């Protein structure tokens, strides 16, 4: 995810540096076991998941830029992502950052693609939880067109099953804030201590 204000290239670089530092500390605490290999290409019913990276920059950019208002209402808590000032250059930096986090086992961002892997329908993000009582926090979004087709709920249900069956987390320790727990309740949970 890229959060950039107008003329915000420096803000983007600073945000990426801060997020990288924060996620590196969390990764050191053992987000996933060393023995676990994060899935690389996952088949759903009528879609596939592939880790975000430079290969997907164009279709990822097209997907979220086609749904700016929808994603600001349904995904971005602050309403600042995506926005029309994001450039393809910003998008490439984001893809490289997501790929780096995946390879470092800090967080796992996946594009949700059609079966031909040419159109992005949305994304799924698996992050370490900063809240007590949870090991992972999962966020997801779908494009406005896919939302209208009912794919948002389908992807959410599929993702819950996928995390339960294919990841090393107890189902009771995976949170989908804004879905299975309200953002208000999530925000009130205690942070994990340093």
Role assignments for model-derived ranges:
Residues 150-158:
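Conserved acetyl-CoA pyrophosphate-binding loop and the N-cap/start of the following alpha-helix
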Residues 28-146, 158, 162, 166-194:
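GNAT-family acyltransferases
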Residues 3, 26-27:
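Residue-level detector of intrinsically disordered, flexible termini
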Residues 22-23:
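N-terminal signal peptide c-region/cleavage motif recognized by signal peptidases
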Residues 2-13:
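Bacterial N-terminal signal peptides that target proteins for export
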């Amino acid at each position: 995810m890229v959060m950039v204000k107008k003329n915000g290239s420096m803000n983007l670089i600073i945000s990426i540096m801060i997020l990288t530092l924060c996620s590196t500390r969390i990764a050191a605490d053992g987000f996933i076991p060393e023995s676990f290999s994060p899935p690389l290409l996952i088949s759903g019913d009528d879609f596939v998941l592939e880790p975000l990276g430079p290969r997907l920059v164009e279709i990822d950019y097209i997907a979220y830029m086609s749904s700016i208002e929808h994603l600001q209402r349904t995904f971005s808590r602050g309403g600042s992502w995506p926005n029309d000032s994001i450039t393809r250059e910003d998008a490439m930096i984001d893809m490289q950052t997501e790929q780096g986090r995946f390879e470092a086992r800090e967080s796992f961002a996946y594009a949700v693609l059609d079966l031909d892997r040419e159109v992005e329908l949305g994304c799924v993000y698996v992050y370490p939880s900063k809240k007590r009582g949870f090991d992972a926090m999962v966020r997801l979004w779908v494009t406005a067109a896919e939302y209208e087709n009912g794919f948002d709920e389908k992807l959410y249900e599929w993702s819950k099953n996928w995390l339960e069956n294919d990841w090393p987390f107890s189902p009771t320790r995976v949170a989908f804030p804004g879905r299975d727990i309200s953002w208000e309740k999530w925000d009130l949970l205690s942070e994990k201590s340093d």
